[in-house]
């Protein structure tokens, strides 16, 4: 009897294992595995995950992705890069996605220093990686210089640092015009430049030094706090003494919260304008204890502002799903749904080389913009985004009494005979303590 049980049990067990692995392999063959990599304990990574989840839910609800004659569902694999604190952790997270999880594609990445390493790993393994957070021009310059090696990388969001600078200067210029018109300031507007000490912001210092005087403004100083500083009172005291009327910010990390809060607590008579990624989130109001009022930041979305006909439906659906306005790192949504999936369905394959050859030549609409990938001045593909009217411009938004409202582009004139205003933008508001200090 023991012999019988043993001889029956072993084949049955073997059969079960075979069926399990066969079923697993079959299921995997019907899935498109997409890695979502980012700092998942922080707002930036959470937004990357939310955008990906929303895209996958919409795609799978319609039956999945049509790959030739086959329908395949999207499966997301989350990877916490911990890249704010460790580039090594970010590198390991990307390695695991590719070698252990066998992903077909990756979206995400945030801190430039970490994304360079992620880019190397993805491209070495011929895995298409759409960056949804890092702005460095060099990420796409690599594509142009070493195309065969780096062609698997595309920028999804934001547009590059050079374009971010152009947009930010436009926001500063619009704010300066409001100050001149409403406060009667006649001399050069005094500007303090404050950028977190990070690689992506380094090129901004010489750009600010060269550009502000041409805009009729005076640079009164440059400050470079840590991206994760919790106390910036020393910097703010110096800025207050400088007499700055605009504080031009470049923050992608958590320093944006204490800076905004402490500046308003001190009632510094100056407008905060520039990039403050933390200010793009609904939690910013609570995080600053209501002291984030009047902060202006470059952004991608604000409720009721429409860049095109796709913007409002996406924003409202996102708010319904997650209870907040999306930020730019939710660009994982369009990177999956419109960049990858639409291209896959066009050509009927997951072959990365064929996807690259098609995607790099596409022009297509997404909720925040129209995507076109530019070539460099030698005619080489860069897989970088075209910036300007009709393409990617972003918006600027301001916190006004607890509401995050779009304020730019509002009669923006990027070229002679061209004026751009997006539906839903509102006028910029000046803090009352600044009005009191300057208006006679």
Predicted regions and their residues:
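Short, polar/charged alpha-helical segment
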Residues: 45-67, 206-214
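Bacterial N-terminal signal peptides
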Residues: 11-22
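Beta-alpha junction/loop-to-helix N-cap segments that form part of ligand/metal-binding clefts
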Residues: 31, 43-50, 65-144, 156, ...
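Segments of small-molecule ligand-sensing domains
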Residues: 320-327, 341-414
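Extracytoplasmic "Venus flytrap"
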Residues: 35-54, 79-87, 110-111, 194-203, ...
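Extracytoplasmic ligand/sensor domains, especially the bilobed periplasmic-binding protein
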Residues: 103-222, 271-297, 304
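Bacterial N-terminal signal peptides that target proteins for export
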Residues: 1-13
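Extracellular/periplasmic periplasmic-binding protein-like sensory domains
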Residues: 136, 140, 158-161, 263-335, ...
């Amino acid at each position: 009897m023991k012999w019988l049980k043993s001889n029956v049990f072993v084949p049955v067990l073997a059969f079960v294992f075979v069926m399990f692995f066969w079923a697993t392999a079959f299921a995997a063959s019907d899935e498109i595995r997409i890695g979502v990599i980012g700092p998942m304990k922080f707002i930036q990574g959470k937004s990357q995950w939310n955008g990906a989840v929303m895209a996958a839910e919409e795609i799978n609800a319609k039956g999945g992705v049509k790959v030739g004659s086959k329908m395949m569902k999207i499966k997301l694999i989350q990877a916490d890069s911990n890249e704010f604190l460790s580039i090594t952790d970010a590198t390991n997270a990307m390695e695991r996605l590719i070698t252990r999880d066998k992903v077909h594609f990756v979206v995400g990445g945030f801190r430039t220093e970490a994304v360079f390493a992620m880019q190397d790993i993805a491209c070495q393994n011929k895995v298409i990686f759409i960056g949804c957070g890092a702005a460095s021009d060099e990420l796409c310059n690599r594509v142009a210089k070493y195309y065969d090696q780096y062609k698997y990388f595309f920028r999804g969001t934001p547009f590059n640092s050079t374009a971010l600078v152009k947009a930010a200067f436009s926001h500063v210029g619009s704010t300066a015009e409001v100050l001149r018109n409403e406060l009667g300031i006649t001399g050069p507007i005094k500007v303090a430049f404050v950028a977190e000490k990070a690689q992506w912001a380094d090129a901004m210092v010489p750009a600010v030094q060269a550009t502000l005087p041409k805009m009729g403004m005076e640079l009164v100083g440059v400050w470079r706090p840590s991206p994760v500083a919790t106390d910036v009172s020393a910097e703010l005291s110096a800025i207050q003494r400088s007499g700055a009327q605009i504080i031009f910010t470049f923050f992608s990390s958590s320093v944006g919260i204490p800076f905004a809060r402490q500046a308003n607590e001190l009632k510094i008579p100056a407008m905060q304008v520039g990039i403050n990624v933390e200010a793009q989130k609904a939690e910013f109001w609570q995080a600053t204890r209501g002291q984030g009022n009047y902060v202006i930041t470059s952004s991608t979305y604000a409720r009721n502002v429409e860049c095109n006909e796709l913007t409002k439906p996406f924003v409202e659906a996102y708010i319904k799903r997650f209870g907040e306005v999306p930020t730019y790192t939710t660009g994982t949504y369009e990177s999956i749904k419109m960049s990858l999936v639409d291209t896959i369905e066009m050509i009927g394959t997951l072959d990365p080389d064929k996807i690259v050859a098609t995607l790099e030549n596409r022009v297509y609409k997404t909720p925040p913009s129209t995507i076109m990938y530019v070539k460099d001045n030698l005619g080489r593909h860069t897989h970088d985004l075209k910036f300007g009217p009709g393409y990617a411009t972003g918006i600027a938004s301001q916190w006004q009494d607890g509401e995050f409202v779009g304020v730019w582009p509002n009669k923006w004139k990027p070229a002679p005979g061209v004026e751009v205003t997006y539906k839903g933008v509102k006028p910029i508001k000046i803090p009352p303590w600044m009005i009191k200090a300057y208006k006679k």
